[in-house]
Amino acid sequence: MNDKNEESIDFGYQKVARNQKKNLVADVFQSVAAKYDVMNDLMSFGIHRLWKRYTIDCSGVRRGMKVLDIAGGTGDLTAQFSRRVGAEGEVVLADINDAMLKVGRDKLRDRGIIGNVRYVQADAEELPFDDNTFDVITIAFGLRNVTDKDKALRSMLRVLKPGGRVLILEFSKPVSATLNQVYDFYSFNILPKMGQVVANDSDSYQYLAESIRMHPDQETLKSMMEAAGYEKVDYQNMTGGVVALHRGYKF
């Protein structure tokens, strides 16, 4: 019988051994961590802030809740959740990459956000938390980098409290053929050059474009969430489907 770790899996448009992908993704984010926020603003023309704000507005997070921000990176969502949960609540910023986690921790501490935020280096596929721990779980622009997405969805469901919700904000498939063509041109011709100029790294942004294309589309991800055990799963397209916000509940 073949070892599952020896099976091939997508890394952008490349096929790599399953047990190699995490290290390859780690290399990407080690490289881009220092310029991650700057590149996000440039790549999305600042629109990523609106996508994240909408996600926060849809989260239902309120005072006293416990929130898990997976692939929380530089802490954009965590910072807002920290204000919402107050001193009685807690936000756990989790990221598999230590460089991204350090950038996020330093940024939030510089802003004086220290009392109710905890930082954990964690793999979304094997979350190191007890069952039924969190009221809300978010993962923004991180699921496409996970090796075993189905396993990660199940892991998130396990640590979600009954009555809790998960929100997945991720690049998706534009609904218009014209927009899709423009998006392809921008992604494959502009992004890598921008990455080279700003972050001295075109390869990581080539991977970014490829990983977006290989990520499940809106309906496929919805079906994956339902298969993992989430209920009342829905999604909303933003910016013509360039990004989609999926929501699911645990009852």
UniProtKB/Swiss-Prot annotation:
Reactions this protein catalyses: a 2-demethylmenaquinol + S-adenosyl-L-methionine = a menaquinol + S-adenosyl-L-homocysteine + H(+); a 2-methoxy-6-(all-trans-polyprenyl)benzene-1,4-diol + S-adenosyl-L-methionine = a 5-methoxy-2-methyl-3-(all-trans-polyprenyl)benzene-1,4-diol + S-adenosyl-L-homocysteine + H(+)
Xref: SUPFAM superfamilies: S-adenosyl-L-methionine-dependent methyltransferases (SSF53335)
GO biological process: aerobic respiration; menaquinone biosynthetic process; methylation
Gene3D superfamilies (alphabetical): Vaccinia Virus protein VP39
Cross-referenced CDD domains: AdoMet_MTases
TM annotation in the entry: none
Pfam families: Ubie_methyltran (PF01209)
One GO MF term: 2-methoxy-6-polyprenyl-1,4-benzoquinol methyltransferase activity
Pathway terms, separated by semicolons: Quinol/quinone metabolism; menaquinone biosynthesis; menaquinol from 1,4-dihydroxy-2-naphthoate: step 2/2; Cofactor biosynthesis; ubiquinone biosynthesis
Chain's role: Methyltransferase required for the conversion of demethylmenaquinol (DMKH2) to menaquinol (MKH2) and the conversion of 2-polyprenyl-6-methoxy-1,4-benzoquinol (DDMQH2) to 2-polyprenyl-3-methyl-6-methoxy-1,4-benzoquinol (DMQH2).
Family matches, as PANTHER family: 2-METHOXY-6-POLYPRENYL-1,4-BENZOQUINOL METHYLASE, MITOCHONDRIAL, METHYLTRANSFERASE
Family: Belongs to the class I-like SAM-binding methyltransferase superfamily. MenG/UbiE family.
Protein name: Ubiquinone/menaquinone biosynthesis C-methyltransferase UbiE
